A protein has these predicted regions:
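Structured-RNA-binding interfaces characteristic of tRNA pseudouridine synthases
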Residues: 1-230
C-alpha cells in the first residue's frame, strides 16, 4: 500500500463537483473530478484503495489547489512514474500541480486547518474570462459590498445561507477579504469548512446589498436569528 498527497487544479465547468457519485458516473452523465481521476488510475492498471479530497465542491466550481490523498495497492509506481501517468491521462481541464509520497495517516479533509474560496466579480463584460467571472451589471457600491461581506466573519449559524444535509449549521469564518484590481473585485473567504452552496449565497447576499437591493442589516439579522430568515 502506497500513500500520496496530491494538489490538483481544475476547471469545473464540465463537472458535478469533486465528489465521486457512484458506479457508472460517466455513462450516466454524472462527471466528477474524483471520478475522472480514479478512472484514469484504474485504466492505467492501478489498484485504487482510497481517494479523498479536502472538501466537496459544488457543480461548476473551479479549483486552484484542491488537496487530495491517494492510497494505491500493491504494484504502485514511483512518484515520478505516477505523475507521468496522470499528466498523460487526465483531460485538458484537470491538472496535477503537486504529487509527493505521504504517511498513510494523512487525510486531506481531516488534516485541513482551513479552506479558501475566491470569487471574481467583473464590473464590465469580458469575452475571454467569462467562465471565471460574475459580470455584475449595475452600479455596485463597493463600500456597502465590503461592509456586508465582512459581516460573515466569525462563528455563525449559517442556516440561512446554505443547503443543509443533517450537518451542524455552525461555521467559523476566519476571514472575508475584498480587493479591487482594475475592473475586477475579488472576494476571498477562509473558513474551517463550508456547507453546500454557502459561499455562493454569501457572495450573492453581499452583491445584492452592494447594488442597493437589500440592506446589510438584513444579512446581520439572518446570521443572528437564522430561524427567522425568509
Amino acid at each position: 500500500r502506497s500513500a500520496f498527497r496530491l494538489v490538483l487544479e481544475y476547471d469545473g465547468s464540465r463537472y458535478m463537483g469533486w465528489q465521486r457519485q457512484g458506479e457508472g458516473q460517466t455513462r450516466a452523465g454524472v462527471r466528477t473530478v474524483a471520478g475522472t481521476l480514479e478512472r484514469v488510475l484504474r485504466e492505467a492498471g492501478l489498484s485504487v484503495l482510497t481517494l479523498g479530497g479536502s472538501g466537496r465542491t459544488d457543480a461548476g466550481v473551479h479549483a486552484l489547489g484542491q488537496v487530495a490523498h491517494l492510497h494505491l495497492g500493491p504494484g504502485a509506481p514511483s512518484p515520478k512514474e505516477l505523475r507521468r501517468l496522470l499528466d498523460e491521462g487526465l483531460p485538458h481541464d484537470v491538472a496535477l500541480r503537486e504529487l509527493a509520497p505521504c504517511g498513510p495517516a494523512f487525510h486531506a479533509r481531516h488534516d485541513a486547518r482551513s479552506r479558501s474560496y475566491l470569487y471574481q466579480l467583473s464590473l464590465r463584460r469580458s469575452a475571454l474570462a467569462k467562465p471565471y467571472l460574475w459580470w455584475v451589471k449595475g452600479a455596485l457600491d463597493l463600500a456597502r459590498l465590503e461592509e456586508t461581506w465582512r459581516l460573515f466573519e466569525g462563528f455563525h449559524d449559517v442556516s440561512a445561507f446554505a443547503d443543509l444535509e443533517r450537518e451542524d449549521p455552525r461555521c467559523e469564518v476566519q476571514a472575508c477579504e475584498l480587493a479591487r484590481e482594475g475592473s475586477l473585485v475579488l472576494l476571498r473567504v477562509t473558513a474551517s469548512h463550508f456547507l453546500r452552496r454557502q459561499v455562493r449565497r454569501m457572495v450573492g447576499a453581499a452583491v445584492w446589498c452592494g447594488l442597493g437591493r437589500e440592506r446589510p442589516a438584513r444579512v446581520a439579522r439572518d446570521l443572528a436569528r437564522p430561524s427567522e430568515a425568509a
